[in-house]
């Protein structure tokens, strides 16, 4: 039902193999997302993302459709409010998509941004509870991906070994990578959000704007460099390096979304390994969709 149209891949670029480029497809039906993922793949993007709603279009069905139509481009969520999930459900969805795509999935997680479309369906348990749930969900996610027998006992979730209908493992080992929001609070000696991000495979960096309750991002290249240094120290304490670890900066080289802007090379020099275009300034309209497609066809801002 889709006809592939070659757009001409953008090659090379001065940032080399270390810097990769993604885009959030902001407003699109499942079919439109799949078509735009094809456009992005042909134009040289490295990954496309969808957002995950509390109620609405299912992110994993959407990514599954894109997985069947594409061959190379990675597929991810930005973001999955993982604390809302039962961890075995999340592990099932991500592993299924990883097998379907041939190992092209990234799970992006955070505590979730509270808004009317969330609170219309469930009360907020509080940031501290969501944080503890997020940690447990990720622990169980990783454990189940490793196969059976697996057992876990936590404050909110538990799991016992099973022997029947055990699914095959994901393609990516030990599991599809997890990228976590990592919020650095300059006034705090302990950085719990960064500690979480350091335990996994990548970080969406953010700088708190005064308090945890108002974490408006104040990310700058110098702040990113400090955050990456802190992550490096945390990983070193656990016997890990930054080799293969992803630092993902969101920005908008076309419009006005957020406070993070190019030049992209400054972010690469500060430690970023991914630049992700987030075009939330575009309207949810035929004109907005046409502009999103045009931006994807231009390819990533490699030069």
Residue ranges, per PLM feature:
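Active-site-adjacent structural elements that line small-molecule/cofactor binding pockets in enzymes
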Residues: 8-303
